[in-house]
Curated annotation (Swiss-Prot):
GO terms for molecular function: hydrolase activity, acting on ester bonds; succinylglutamate desuccinylase activity; zinc ion binding. It catalyses: N-succinyl-L-glutamate + H2O = L-glutamate + succinate. This is Succinylglutamate desuccinylase. Pfam families: AstE_AspA_cat (PF24827), AstE_AspA_hybrid (PF04952). The lineage of its organism: Bacteria, Pseudomonadati, Pseudomonadota, Gammaproteobacteria, Enterobacterales. It comes from the Bacteria. Transforms N(2)-succinylglutamate into succinate and glutamate.
């Protein structure tokens, strides 16, 4: 199964759907779904996902290289792993999504969207995670969902963590820093993301990793992701990574800007970078007689997008944590 990506992009079902690797067993579970189980007993389970948005190809290429290293035996596997290529049809077409944004659908929210390939896939992925986690006795559960951003950013690599009722474990946050993340953003409310689903329903330590800018297959400079790739290799092999000398900056979400109608106007242009700062009182958006302004001394924008569908998020506003 050293051609997992090619099979996923072509929509081809392999002739052989399970076999042996170098110190592990593999099972092809469906298009874009591959389970890896070490021969030796382990108590750690990891979801490694990419391609939830089909135009975010660098993380997919990164996972493909990690799989090649595992199959060649140059990388040892010490976790049960479910590899997920989230949206195969959008990946093959080179587009963000075919009908609707899947990363708003998890936790059953797909039921409120018009039926499409994405709603069916979101349901399939929910069931796949349920089966994966329920079939083992993992003491440690992680989910790393790899993305790239539409816009440039003041932080080249950053992580977005779902709302969580319990404190985050220090070793997980330390690993994110060792993986080269320059900033961590903490959600304060539930959402429809893949990582919120795995955290809420299975207690996984989950993070969406944003690793640079979205580019087509073959146009990615994977050297800029080398620190993350090396950290993933060490993680899979059970090798402790050195702590970052500069821990990631921390932010929390303080508000969400939502587009409700065609009257919506977001006062940020296409060159506005993620983590751009705005002073208190700045007008951020208008919709009819509703005005959205900065209420804290300084707020930072994340994922500004004026062209989202009505009812969806047009941006997040953040506050820097000490």
């Amino acid at each position: 199964m050293d051609n997992f990506l090619a099979l996923t992009l072509s929509g081809t079902t392999p002739r052989v759907t399970q076999g042996k690797g170098a110190g592990f067993r593999w099972r092809w579970l469906g298009h874009g779904l591959l389970e890896l189980t070490p021969d030796a007993p382990v108590d750690r389970a990891l979801i490694l996902s990419a391609g939830i948005h089909g135009n975010e190809t660098a993380p997919v290429e990164m996972l493909d290289k990690l799989l090649s290293a595992l199959y060649s035996g140059s990388l040892t596997l010490t976790w049960r792993v479910l590899v997920v290529l989230g949206n195969p049809q959008a990946l093959a077409a080179g587009i963000r999504y075919c009908h609707s944004d899947m990363n708003r659908m998890f936790g059953g929210r797909w039921q409120s969207f018009a039926e499409s390939d994405e709603t069916r896939r979101a349901r399939e992925l929910e069931l796949s995670l349920d089966t994966f986690f329920s079939s083992g006795q993992a003491r440690v559960r992680w989910h790393l969902d790899l993305h790239t951003a539409i816009r440039g950013s003041h932080h080249l690599r950053f992580g977005v963590l779902p709302q969580r009722d319990r404190p985050w474990e220090a070793d997980f946050l330390a690993w994110l820093g060792a993986a080269g993340l320059e900033a961590l953003v903490f959600h304060q409310a539930p959402g429809g993301t893949f990582t919120h689903f795995s955290s809420e329903h299975f207690g996984a330590l989950s993070c969406t990793l944003e690793l640079g800018k979205a580019l087509p297959f073959g146009q990615n400079d994977l050297t800029q992701f080398s620190v993350t790739s090396q950290a993933l290799s060490a993680l899979l092999s059970g090798i402790e990574t050195s702590t970052s000398s500069s821990p990631p900056l921390r932010y929390r979400v303080v508000s969400q800007i939502t587009r409700h109608s065609d009257k919506f106007a977001l006062y940020m242009d296409a060159q506005t970078l993620n983590f751009t700062a705005f002073a208190k009182g700045t007008l951020l958006a208008e919709e009819g007689d509703k005005r959205v302004t900065v209420t804290h001394d300084v707020e930072y924008v994340l994922f500004p997008n004026p062209s989202v569908a009505c009812g969806l998020r047009a941006g997040l506003m953040l506050e820097r944590l000490p």
